[in-house]
């Protein structure tokens, strides 16, 4: 379903049927956004000019509905395969978009451009329709920028939720003595040593207790040089600095992390998969800061959870609120 890639490079549409495929749509949209982010603007050939914005939108939907690659090339331009992933699109994702389109659709005006809006939740196609002296066309460059912006926003929200999941996982982990030494402690790593339960995730056999953290998150956070998890890398911090509540102290005592826990998350590719970096500690409050283009090196060098005034506290994400 190569044609359907145009549909799913964005947020969920919001209809009930769309929500059933939200996870699948997200994975495809992420791939599409990354592919488009790497595309030089010079490769974007001119798409067809239409008499109205509605005509342009209708042509796109018709191409998607028929899975007509030739028609899509006319709508978006002959180089569409360069920036739209040609494989891995599920038909149900396409059908979800078409169902939302059938339920309700219109041309939304704003910011000097037109956008195809589908469903009842105000979702718009990320590629805008612009007017020129000869008519209306899809603006692929602006679509690229919008896709990246949506991807970053989505990844950052997911990362904040992932840190809250880490917070819950550490508290769950510390509620049980995992090595029989009668000492409750927090985990110092995400993945357990094979055959042990010394991390937040381990392979559970039938009848054994489940690990606090899911396998997908744990596996990706352990890959320091790979794609990360939802566009972010994660590190566990084992101490806190003077700016943290309670002042500076080590979480690890006698080899056991008993005094608290913390973690930092930073973008895999700054400006493409994320902008903000995030931290959380045993207090359950997420902090954020733009560490800049050198953020990965800064985050990797961090030894302590030390949210000074340059880190913004996200009150809405505080645990228990």
Give residue spans per PLM region.
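Short, Lys/Arg-enriched N-terminal segments with co-localized hydrophobic residues
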Residues: 1-18
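Bacterial N-terminal signal peptides that target proteins for export
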Residues: 18-31
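Bacterial N-terminal signal peptides
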Residues: 28-40
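Flexible, glycine-rich surface segments
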Residues: 173-274
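Short beta-strand edge/turn micro-motifs at domain boundaries
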Residues: 114-157, 161-164, 168, 285-289
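Conserved hydrophobic/amphipathic alpha-helical signal-anchor segments
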Residues: 51-68, 73, 144-194
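Surface-exposed, charged secondary-structure patches
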Residues: 81-125, 223-230, 235-242, 249-257
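Sec/Tat signal peptide C-region and signal peptidase I cleavage site
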Residues: 17, 39-45
């Amino acid at each position: 379903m190569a044609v359907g890639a145009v549909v799913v490079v964005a947020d969920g549409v919001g209809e009930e049927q769309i929500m059933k495929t939200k996870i699948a749509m997200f994975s495809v949209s992420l791939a599409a956004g990354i592919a488009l982010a790497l595309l030089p603007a010079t490769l974007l050939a001119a798409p067809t000019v239409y008499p109205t914005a509605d005509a342009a939108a209708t042509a796109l939907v018709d191409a998607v509905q028929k899975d007509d690659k030739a028609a899509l090339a006319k709508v978006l331009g002959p180089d569409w395969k360069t920036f739209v992933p040609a494989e891995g699109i599920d038909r149900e994702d396409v059908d979800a978009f078409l169902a939302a389109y059938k339920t309700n659709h219109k041309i939304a005006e704003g910011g000097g451009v037109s956008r195809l809006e589908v469903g009842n939740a105000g979702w718009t196609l990320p590629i805008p329709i612009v007017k020129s002296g000869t008519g209306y066309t899809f603006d692929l460059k602006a679509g690229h920028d919008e896709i990246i912006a949506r991807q970053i926003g989505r990844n950052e929200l997911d990362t904040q939720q992932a840190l809250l999941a880490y917070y819950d996982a550490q508290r769950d982990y510390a509620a049980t003595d995992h090595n029989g030494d009668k000492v409750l402690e927090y985990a110092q790593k995400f993945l357990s040593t094979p055959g042990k339960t010394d991390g937040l995730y381990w392979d559970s056999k039938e009848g054994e207790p489940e690990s606090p953290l899911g396998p997908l998150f744990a596996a990706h956070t352990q890959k320091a040089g790979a794609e990360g998890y939802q566009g972010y890398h994660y590190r566990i911090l084992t101490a806190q600095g003077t700016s943290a509540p309670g002042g500076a102290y080590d979480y690890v005592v006698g080899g056991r992390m008993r005094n608290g826990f913390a973690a930092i998350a930073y973008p895999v590719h700054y400006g493409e998969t994320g902008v903000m970096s995030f931290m959380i500690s045993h207090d359950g409050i997420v902090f954020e800061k733009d560490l800049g283009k050198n953020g990965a090196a800064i985050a990797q060098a961090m030894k302590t959870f030390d949210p000074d005034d340059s880190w913004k506290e996200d009150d809405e994400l505080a645990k228990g609120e």
